[in-house]
Curated annotation (Swiss-Prot):
ATP binds at residues 10-17. Coiled coil: none annotated. CDD domains: TMPK. It comes from the Archaea. NCBIfam families: DTMP_kinase. One of its GO terms (biological process) is dUDP biosynthetic process. Its EC number is 2.7.4.9. This is Probable thymidylate kinase.
């Protein structure tokens, strides 16, 4: 039986990575032995290229192809084999981040960049079975990012507002897959809600 793919999405500063760690540490979820991963990948040739691009002024189209190459490698080496072996996979960021973020960075290049980026993935990506969208006002998110230290080029209010709008468009188009979480709520409350829903989903399919 094929495993299921669960993804966590949201703008920078939404708190999703913190929740991802809590999910990984949760003993009730650990019982089911899911595979935990992230995008961009860490410690890989493609993932390192993406991280370097984020920290530089790489051309937006070149940047998209680096992200997409990392996604393809991630699918081939980890996600697809794990799912084929019946493992459930939980990923901190996945393809929806690319649609939402590069759907903004490429606005000057294409009439409908979000759809164009999605079309690049048609036929070969794996669509998640469940996606949590950590929704939050960009002002709050940027304030959180500032507390972490130096900001990246993606952590600007106007930019993140456009990314947030793209995420909400994606969620509205696929309500059966997306669970929108109010990430402005206290961190502990958000963690408990998401962990509860992840556990219920895994128990239901096991």
């Amino acid at each position: 039986m094929r495993g299921k793919l669960i993804t966590l999405e949201g703008i920078d500063g939404s708190g999703k990575s913190t929740v991802a760690k809590k999910i990984q540490e949760n003993p009730e979820i650990q019982v089911f032995d899911p595979v935990f991963t992230r995008e961009p990948t860490r410690g890989t040739l493609t993932g390192t290229a993406v991280e370097n691009a984020i920290q530089s002024e790489t051309d937006q189209l070149a940047e998209l192809f680096l992200f997409t190459a990392d996604h393809a490698e991630h699918l081939a080496k980890l996600v697809k084999p794990a799912l084929a072996n019946g493992k459930n996979v939980i990923s901190d960021r996945y393809s929806d981040s690319r649609y939402a973020y590069q759907g903004v960075t490429l606005k000057s290049r294409f009439e409908n960049p979000l759809e164009w980026v999605r079309s690049l993935h048609s036929g070969w990506t794996v669509v998640p079975d469940l996606t949590f969208l950590f929704d939050i006002e960009p002002e709050i998110a940027v304030e959180r990012c500032g507390k972490r230290g130096e900001q990246t080029k993606f952590e600007k209010i106007e930019f993140l507002q456009n990314v947030r709008e793209n995420f909400l468009i994606l969620a509205a188009e696929d309500p059966g897959r997306f669970v929108v979480i109010d990430a402005s709520r206290p961190q502990e409350e958000v963690e408990k809600k998401v962990i509860k829903k992840v556990l219920e989903f895994i128990q239901r399919i096991s």
